[in-house]
Amino acid sequence: MNNGYYAVALDKESCNVVKRNATMDVVVGNHITLAYKPNNKTFEKLNKLCGKKVDVYIKEKRANKNIEAFWLNGMYLTETYKKLKRVDKGPAHITISHKKGFKSGDANTMFKNPTYKQDLQTEMEYLQGKIKWIIN
């Protein structure tokens, strides 16, 4: 097992767009986790994509009283427009912000029964980032 994770690290402009939507204490909004502590096969597969640009499309903003996130409509490699999928369980998302005492990973529990849901497919342009290996 590899101690780190692959993510789409959002560029500065995209981070700013995400952070402008934050309403809670701890603002995150800088990446989309693809694979956390991946096995060797997944590590090698995603390692070949490091540095590649990705276009990210937002479907909805979902939230509960503790955390809020953008739920994604899709991620595509900019160069080839090949679809990029999250390897880990749960929907691909960008944690926007959360209350103190919670962590970004708690967003996974919120997607099934959010108390707030807003469709953003026609309102938001796409975000951009690059695939990156991040060491814990």
Describe each PLM feature range:
Residues 1-136:
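Histidine-dependent nucleotide/RNA phosphoesterase domain, centered on the 2H-phosphoesterase fold
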